[in-house]
Regions:
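Beta->alpha turn/N-cap motifs
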Residues: 10-11, 35-36, 46-60, 70, ...
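Pocket-lining segment of extracytoplasmic ligand-binding domains
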Residues: 129-220
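Secondary-structure end/capping motifs
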Residues: 193-260
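Hydrophobic residues within well-ordered alpha-helices
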Residues: 43-44, 135-137, 261
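A structural signal for short loop-to-beta-strand junctions that line the ligand-binding cleft
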Residues: 65-73
């Protein structure tokens, strides 16, 4: 049985839709759903064979190969990686303030640190176990929201005094002119060497499911919206902001992200990307 991880956010429901609804037949696979940080722990502990993980976790873990042609990437605005606050109006207002960071994120937590350091903004970072923005703002001046929590927060903007002071995808785009790669699909190196045909099989199914999703984005957005209690039209807009390919432009952006992380002291060494080669 192949153990396949899945991020428990709407942005991962989309590329898995064809697989999970038996549109893309798949056999001898167990899908294990969790948040990105926990998935990284599971694949590191050999509890998963293949999984999406926060992109920043790739250089922090050993003996992983990247699967080609699939990622979770934004071209600009993300709508699901946000800094929100009640009283503050911009990232510059965070200077000397406290920013709550959910423990379920790694890439976004690194990205906000890079953005603030590059802007010369220094604040206090407060790890938070909960994801409710109201709880986070009781102990901090601003909150980093990711995934479905961010989407739900946007839906409530007109009903509360909560404000989005930054969309990190847009901030990264403004700083670098590049896409932002949030998640990668990886396989344990020893597993790939022992069972290359199984990895090839899963990759093929993932890419077919991803392609099905792109061809049926409106239909799937309606269904995911109902499941997540998010307006269907907004869900369609959200899914259109994301890119699930992993082309050369995305690879270049990922390398830039790792370079900045190292410059900011958030990575210890330079990163060498290793890919699973189809047909090995």
């Amino acid at each position: 049985m192949i153990r396949l991880g899945k991020i428990g956010f709407a942005n991962c429901d989309f590329p898995y839709y064809g697989i999970e609804h038996n549109i893309i037949p798949i056999e001898k696979v167990t899908i294990i759903e969790s948040h990105p940080v926990n998935l990284a722990k599971k694949i590191s502990n050999r509890e998963l064979d293949i999984s999406p993980i926060s992109s920043i976790m790739y250089p922090k873990l050993s003996n992983l190969w990247i699967l080609p042609d699939i990622s979770i990437t934004s071209n600009d605005f993300t709508k699901s990686v946000l800094v929100c606050a009640n009283e503050l109006g911009s990232l510059e207002d965070l200077s000397g303030k406290t920013l709550c960071i959910p423990e379920t994120t790694a890439t976004s937590a690194t990205l906000i640190r890079i953005l603030l350091l590059k802007k010369g903004i220094h604040c206090k970072y407060m790890p938070c176990k909960g994801l409710e923005v109201s709880d986070m703002l009781k102990i901090g001046d601003a909150a980093l929201l990711i995934g479905d929590s961010a989407l739900h927060a946007i839906m409530k903007l007109n009903k509360t005094k909560l404000k989005v002071i930054a969309d990190l995808g847009n901030e990264w785009k403004n700083m670098t002119g590049k896409k932002m790669v949030y998640a990668l699909w990886v396989v344990r190196e020893e597993y790939a060497k022992k069972y290359p045909e199984k990895v090839e099989y899963i990759l093929k199914k993932l890419l077919l499911s991803k392609d099905y999703g792109m061809e049926h984005i409106s239909e799937i957005a309606d269904l995911i919206g109902k499941k997540k209690n998010i307006d269907s039209e907004f869900m369609r807009e959200y899914l259109h902001t994301l890119n699930y390919d992993f082309d050369m432009e995305s690879i270049d952006s990922l390398k830039q992200f790792f370079k900045y992380a190292k410059e900011c002291g958030l990575l210890e060494k330079e990163v060498n990307l290793k890919f699973f080669e189809r047909g090995i």
